[in-house]
Amino acid sequence: MASSDFDGILLGMGNPLLDVSAVVDQQFLDKYDIKLNNAILAEDKHLPMYDEMSQKFNVEYIAGGATQNSIKVAQWMLQVPGATSYMGSIGKDKYGEAMKKDATAAGVYVHYYEDEATPTGTCGVCVLGGERSLIANLSAANCYKVEHLKKPENWALVEKAKFYYIAGFFLTVSPESIQLVREHAAANNKVFTMNLSAPFICEFFKDVQEKCLPYMDYIFGNETEARTFSRVHGWETDDVEQIAIKMSQLPKASGTYKRTTVITQGADPVVVAEDGKVKKYPVIPLPKEKLVDTNGAGDAFVGGFLSQLVHGKGIEECVRAGCYASNVVIQRSGCTYPEKPDFN
């Protein structure tokens, strides 16, 4: 495909957050009741945590947010300026400006809604032994309005795109926006993809998630989220392969594409279910001493996967690209990457 064919081919919508990342100790995790390998929304008890992190530990500030990470990684893998675009809500403040600069430098075409009254959202990333836990204080990210999406200059991004990716986290913010995008995708034979994102989404936002399920052509998630999904739906199995098959067989709103379920399992093989069959793909092994942190690993996997999907590549290539991207990211702090990919 000519590079002009890739113009705005992939659109992401989600919660743009500034990652406040630090290697912490067990005492800190216990104090704030934080479990590793989890993602939650901040409660009042977590609010002093962000300041305490910056006082006690060596903190890094990295532009993040699950969907934004994936879109940036896809953009990096594609190496075609303007191939991706992204919408979400930030505050009118220095963090928001930093986010804009970072995403634009990454080559992503961003159309943020800017909320006058609320600060840009942050996400505490607590790292211990290479594992991460996410505590998101959405702030401005929670203020995205469907009216912003409906503006002609923003809806034009929806019309231009052929692939859509929305993390499950956005279900807590603007289900109306997701509805407009998924219905457009189904009506125009475009590819709509989502992520389970976190156990709490599967558990406490089950109803809004269920409304999206028929529209999902690809469902991404990790083993913990898949097992929570299974429990919440009364499937009575913890077997990730069985869960992946069941998810791929849930009813579809449009018959254009069969649904594919893609479940990552950390260092264990990636499980892919389609057509009632399961395939497993090994990840790239990494010696423990090379692991910096797993923050952004799942996001990077999706970004790599989507970069090949928009090229029309088969599942095997998409998974290989996903594994490559996440392997790069876990050797660095946060969801960051070198200037150019080395994927061929």
From Swiss-Prot:
It comes from the Eukaryota. Widely expressed. CDD domains: adenosine_kinase (cd01168). It is an enzyme of class 2 (transferase). Keywords: ATP-binding, Host-virus interaction, Kinase, Magnesium, Nucleotide-binding, Purine salvage, Transferase. The keyword Nucleotide-binding applies. Its EC number is 2.7.1.20. Its cofactor is Mg(2+). GO terms for molecular function: adenosine kinase activity; ATP binding; copper ion binding. GO terms for biological process: adenosine salvage; AMP salvage; response to trehalose-6-phosphate. It catalyses: adenosine + ATP = AMP + ADP + H(+). Inactivated by the begomovirus AL2 protein or the curtovirus L2 protein. InterPro entries: Adenokinase, Carboh/pur_kinase_PfkB_CS, PfkB_dom, Ribokinase-like. The active site is at D299. Pfam families: PfkB. One of its GO terms (cellular component) is apoplast. Coiled coil: none annotated. ATP dependent phosphorylation of adenosine and other related nucleoside analogs to monophosphate derivatives. Essential to sustain methyl recycling. Belongs to the carbohydrate kinase PfkB family. This is Adenosine kinase 1. It comes from Arabidopsis thaliana. The lineage of its organism: Eukaryota, Viridiplantae, Streptophyta, Embryophyta, Tracheophyta.
